UniProtKB/Swiss-Prot annotation:
GO terms for molecular function: N-succinylarginine dihydrolase activity. Belongs to the succinylarginine dihydrolase family. InterPro entries: AstB_sf, SuccinylArg_d-Hdrlase_AstB. Catalyzes the hydrolysis of N(2)-succinylarginine into N(2)-succinylornithine, ammonia and CO(2). The gene is astB. Keywords: Arginine metabolism, Hydrolase. Substrate binds at residues 19-28, 110, 137-138, 212, 250, 359. This is N-succinylarginine dihydrolase.
Length: 447
């Protein structure tokens, strides 16, 4: 059956700031306390979405979350009106204010893990929301992510949305950032590669930085998504590269159809894994980048592998990269050698995503891949699909509501909270989402 990969990109939120909240993510921690530009960040993301849509790649948008997230501050013991809560937390515990104001939901590669209908036992598209429990600021995302996904994939006959796994370390799940699908045409059954960093009883794990994904979580997600057990492989990420800042697998590997583009040190027992894939995926091709050409450190600093590998109609592929790759002589030299070599990658497309990159999120972090048949695509909420009209409407919306300068101190401004709620009210109408945000359901209005 014909099917297409649709990229659902996260729209950067109004409180995008640099707080260094993500231990193990070296870009995040190294840019701590810099001044951010939320308006520019959102527009950079929108330009990528629109450019890819114009090239014929189906593209959609997932909206930001409500931030600062007052309900969690109340759970932490701060009381009074919303404005009083903000004032108290800013004075008594400003680190909590930064956490509940994080714009991290924009990295929707961590929103959920997706199983296309060709791979599932019941023939539905399944999405399991990620619990993201390794980081406090990200663990807050799951309930609203679930509401948003249900508003976008709202046809229950076609889509099954599963709640996040229990919020315990044993079941740490980071979503599609640790998941790859390999195979032939998108509409054919594929092999799902779940990548984990640790498992109970296995001493092989990183020592410097945390392994956020567990094998136990990956196995549970595969069950929830009803993936045919014959189409699943579980593989461990190399603990040594996690300790070098590879906090998700999509920082060291990316797949598309029959191609796996990865660093030669990406996986534990890599030769064994590639042999397994070769035996199970017709025409499988591994493009392994040697450490002698690109070090793990350079891969992390340029986000070479946090790229999008997209199929064109003629069967060739395009690699979507952040500008940092072009600015690194060694990485750019390797990429031009790659273009000249015998493989399906025929084009490099470079985007300026500096605002997201400085917080540790490249092109692949910003998108959730969902393979859909034509019938399934028609069942998606049409208001989120990128086109000229939506692009212009979202740009105008960003221009109206987003600040062009934000520091950690600005997060205590009650006006920022009101601006954000008004903006999300307007956006949820624009995208035909209904009342997906807690402040809407509580009748909080714009106050």
């Amino acid at each position: 059956m014909n099917a297409w990969e649709v990229n659902f990109d996260g729209l950067v939120g109004l409180t995008h700031h640099y707080a260094g909240l993500s231990f193990g993510n070296e870009a995040s921690t190294s840019h701590r306390f810099q001044v951010s530009n939320p308006r520019l960040a959102a527009k950079q993301g929108l330009l990528k979405m629109k450019a890819l849509a114009d090239l014929g790649f189906p593209q959609a948008v997932i909206p930001p979350h409500e931030r600062p997230f007052i309900p969690v501050l109340r759970q932490l013991g701060f009381s009074g009106s919303d404005e009083q809560v903000l004032e108290k937390v800013a004075r008594q515990a400003p680190h909590w204010l930064s956490s509940v104001s994080s714009a991290s939901p924009m990295w929707v590669a961590n929103a959920a893990t997706v199983a296309p209908s060709a791979d599932t036992l019941d023939g539905k598209v399944h999405l399991t929301v990620a619990n993201l429990n390794n980081k406090f600021h990200r663990s807050l995302e799951a309930p609203v992510t679930e509401s948003l996904l249900k508003a976008i994939f709202n046809e229950e006959k076609k889509f099954a949305i599963h709640s996040a796994l229990p919020q315990v370390a044993l079941l740490g799940d980071e979503g599609a950032a640790n998941h790859n699908r390999l195979g032939g045409h998108y509409g054919e059954p594929g092999i799902q590669l779940f990548v984990y960093g640790r498992e109970e009883g296995n001493v092989s794990r990183p020592s410097r930085y945390p392994a956020r994904q567990t094998r136990e979580a990956s196995e549970a997600v595969a069950r929830l998504n009803q993936v045919n057990p014959q189409q699943v492989i579980f593989a461990q990420q190399n603990p040594d590269v996690i300790d070098q800042g590879v906090f998700h697998n999509d920082v060291i590997a990316v797949s598309n159809r029959q191609v796996l583009f990865c660093h030669q040190q990406a996986f534990a027992r890599q030769a064994q894994l590639l042999a397994n894939l070769r035996s199970r995926v017709n025409g499988f091709m591994a493009i392994e980048v040697p450490a002698t050409q690109v070090s793990v450190s350079d891969a992390v600093s340029t986000y070479l592998f946090n790229s999008q590998l997209l199929s064109r109609d003629d069967g060739s592929m395009m690699l979507v990269l952040p500008q940092e790759c072009r600015e690194h002589a060694g990485v750019w030299g390797y990429l031009n050698e790659l273009l000249a070599a015998d493989n399906p990658i025929r084009e490099l497309k470079v985007f300026d995503l500096r605002e997201s990159m400085a917080n540790g999120g490249g092109p692949a972090c910003l998108r959730l891949r969902v393979v859909l048949t034509e019938e399934e695509r028609r069942a998606v909420n049409p208001a989120v699909m990128m086109n000229d009209t939506l692009f212009n409407a979202l740009n105008d919306w960003v221009e109206r509501y987003y600040r062009d300068r934000l520091t950690a101190a600005d997060l205590a401004d009650p006006l920022l909270l009101r601006e954000g709620r008004e903006a999300l009210d307007v956006l949820s109408q624009l995208l035909n989402l209904g009342s997906v945000y807690p402040f809407q359901r509580e009748g909080g209005g714009n106050g």
